[in-house]
């Protein structure tokens, strides 16, 4: 089975995904088109960064990107950190508790598992790179209020018990 996921780099939210029997530019195009529509980003200037795999360089996908005003960007050969966000996401996916180490019995089982993973990742997973808010909170713009509230709570605790604090608080 082949998983296509679209990640918003700013918020780390998975904005599109699908599991297919085969890898193809047509399948990648479907996921991108759905994500753009679901996020309300028609005619917005976007950039899609992908590896150099054939599904993301095929004519079908390039036509879709052009039609949606999306600029393609590709990883450079032999530059390991060009696709770091995607690599980190897939690592999280494969190492989350409950990942079936022996694979999936069916396409439907894979789709159900990924659906549950995406829901967890977007709405429950407190992401270290975005200061321990969820990707959905950051995507909706709620992170600033959450971080301000967290900071105020830490400041109040510090003022109430300064002996418990030896330095600055982390994010």
Residue positions per predicted region:
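Charged DNA-binding/catalytic regions of mobile-element recombinases
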Residues: 1-171
